[in-house]
């Protein structure tokens, strides 16, 4: 059974709590951790569009929030960017 949800993932905490040279990698980890927590699964696959959105303005200027569409198929969670 497939389960589909739309989330707005806040990344403001990542911006405020990390040095400028580590913001994008930490944002990617924060997205993955958010989806693990909310979808209750350990296997999370992020689409390349999410990666491009976070890294769009370089390492230290990440977006404040990201909207993603998440589909859970069994134990696997797949996320794609909305916009």
Swiss-Prot record:
Query: PROSITE patterns, alphabetically?
Result: RIBOSOMAL_L31E
Give UniProt keywords alphabetically. Ribonucleoprotein, Ribosomal protein
Kindly give the SUPFAM superfamilies that the UniProt entry links to this protein.
Ribosomal protein L31e
Give the Gene Ontology MF terms in alphabetical order.
structural constituent of ribosome
Q: Which domain of life is it from?
A: Archaea
> Does this entry carry the keyword RNA-binding?
no
Which Gene Ontology CC terms are recorded?
A: cytosolic large ribosomal subunit
Family statement drawn from the similarity comment of this UniProt entry: Belongs to the eukaryotic ribosomal protein eL31 family.
Q: What is this protein called?
A: Large ribosomal subunit protein eL31
Instruction: Write the gene name.
Output: rpl31e
């Amino acid at each position: 059974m497939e389960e589909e949800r739309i989330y707005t993932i806040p990344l403001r905490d990542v911006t405020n709590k990390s040095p400028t040279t580590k913001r994008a990698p930490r944002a990617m980890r924060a997205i993955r951790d958010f989806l693990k927590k909310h979808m209750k699964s350990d296997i999370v696959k992020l689409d390349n569009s999410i990666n491009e959105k976070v890294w769009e303005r370089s390492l230290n200027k990440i977006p404040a929030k990201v909207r993603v569409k998440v589909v859970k198929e069994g134990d696997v969670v797949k996320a794609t960017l909305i916009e």
